[in-house]
Design a protein with these regions (language model features):
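Non-ligating segments of multi-cofactor redox enzymes
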Residues: 1-61, 68-70, 74-112
């Protein structure tokens, strides 16, 4: 115990230097989705909303409403529609304004 304490004082925190330096493990983190409006159709948006376990997605007319604050980055939507949804790679999403986390994605894809 004493050894670990002294080593910790000498080296400081060694598990990560984030945010002072980029975290090497960040590329392995699951991140919220990014949507391609031109690849989204109304039907696809409805299907994505139906499979989202956290209720982070719903369609409002020709807009897919995405609540980043409710998203758990589970990846189901990206697996369902890989052409329209990809991982964003973003995880620094903290904000004091809840409304910033509500994204309105226009649906521009044509129905097949
Ligand atoms: S990653 Fe999961 S929780 Fe987030 S929007 Fe997609 S299905 Fe919903």
């Amino acid at each position: 115990m004493t050894f670990w304490f002294i080593r910790g004082l000498r080296r400081g925190v060694v598990t990560t230097r984030y945010p002072a330096r980029p975290d090497r493990a960040a590329r392995y983190l699951p991140t919220p989705p990014a949507f391609r409006p031109e690849a989204l159709t109304r039907q696809a948006a409805d299907e994505l909303a139906a499979i989202c376990p956290s209720g982070a997605l719903h369609r409002d007319g020709s807009v897919l409403v995405y609540d980043v604050g409710a998203c758990t980055a589970c990846g189901r939507c990206a697996a369902e529609a890989p052409g329209a949804v990809t991982a964003s790679g973003q995880f620094e999403l903290a904000t004091t304004d809840r409304s910033v986390l509500i994204k309105k994605i226009p649906i521009r894809g044509e129905a097949p």
